[in-house]
UniProtKB/Swiss-Prot annotation:
GO terms for biological process: protein refolding. The lineage of its organism: Bacteria, Bacillati, Bacillota, Bacilli, Lactobacillales. The keyword DNA repair does not apply. Keywords: Chaperone, Cytoplasm, Disulfide bond, Redox-active center, Stress response, Zinc. InterPro entries: Heat_shock_Hsp33, Heat_shock_Hsp33_C, Heat_shock_Hsp33_N. This is 33 kDa chaperonin. The gene is hslO. Disulfide bonds join 235-237, 268-271. It is found in: Cytoplasm. Under oxidizing conditions two disulfide bonds are formed involving the reactive cysteines. Under reducing conditions zinc is bound to the reactive cysteines and the protein is inactive.
Length: 290
């Protein structure tokens, strides 16, 4: 089961989130049938949103949009504070050449664009922030958002590793944040450790990558595990929700669907689930509108 571990240095100077998101990204790949580069780009966005959602309280909903002008198109993810995330990538078929070590490239092909976050607290006034894509690697773009919009200096690492068949092998990441009151000496020590950390892809390839990430972040520094919470890919779509959407259409449009297509098929963008509405269903909707 996927999980996020929240921890804090015993000194109180830093906190870290470490994630195993393997099943989340694997299920997203399965539902959207994504090729290698699309899988990694979508996976990184899902992991970034899992981190962002874990930082919120209450029943907030968090939307992350990675909008680039490349062949990926846009990437949309929605998460809640209970560990659930869903998402899709506009172009599922991007399969760009890999590096000599087999890593999938994303950043050089993302193009120009923006990292957009929308945090809905349920009050009717969602908070929206837009920052430019800095590298297109998504992790660095997320870190830039946290620094610029939330005024919280953060180190982010996230990635998706694929096997020889381009299926998800492991996915995960981390976030380290400076907390108020950290001394310059403590900050310098952590900056040095982060600079010396092995690449995120190397740590994810470890036998137990969650422990490997924590060890790389803290080293000999004492720390406390604050919580361990489950994560999952879960879509909240339903037939009732799409039925309500159809009810917003004019009766003439519903009748046209009956006449031309003998009903309607609606496919959820986030999970690919198909909902069929036959002629009888459509006629019932028209009668309900009458």
């Amino acid at each position: 089961m996927d999980k996020i571990i929240k921890s804090i240095a015993q000194s109180g100077a830093f906190r870290a989130y470490v994630l195993d998101s393997t099943e989340t990204v694997a299920l997203a790949q399965e539902k959207h049938n994504t090729l290698s580069s699309s899988t990694v780009a979508l996976g990184r966005t899902l992991i970034a949103n899992q981190i962002l959602a874990a930082n919120q309280k209450g029943d907030s909903k968090i939307t992350v949009k990675v909008i680039g002008d490349s062949s990926f198109g846009h990437i949309i993810s929605v998460a809640d504070t209970k560990g659930h995330v869903k998402g899709y990538i506009q172009n599922t078929g991007v399969d760009i050449k890999k590096t000599a070590t087999g890593e999938v490239l994303v950043g050089p092909f993302m193009g120009n664009g923006h990292f957009v976050t929308i945090i809905d607290y349920g009050t009717g006034n969602p908070y929206t922030s837009t920052t430019p894509l800095i590298t297109g690697e998504i992790g660095e773009d997320f870190a830039y958002y946290l620094t610029e919009s939330e005024q919280t200096p953060s180190a982010i690492g996230l990635n998706v590793l694929l096997d020889e068949n381009d299926k998800v092998k492991v996915a995960g990441g981390f976030m380290v944040q400076v907390l108020p009151g950290a001394s310059e000496e403590e900050i310098a020590r952590y900056e040095k450790r982060l600079q010396e950390m092995p690449a995120i892809s190397h740590l994810l390839a470890s036998k137990n990558h969650v422990d490997a990430l924590l060890e790389a972040i803290y080293g000999d520094e004492p720390y406390k595990r604050l919580s361990e919470e489950p994560l999952s890919f879960q879509c909240d779509c339903s037939r009732e929700r799409f039925e309500a959407a159809l009810m917003t259409l004019p009766k003439a449009d519903l009748q046209a669907m009956i006449d031309e297509d003998k009903g309607a098929e609606i496919v959820c963008q986030f999970c690919g689930t198909k909902y069929q509405f036959n002629e009888s269903d459509m006629e019932a909707l028209i009668n309900d509108k009458a």
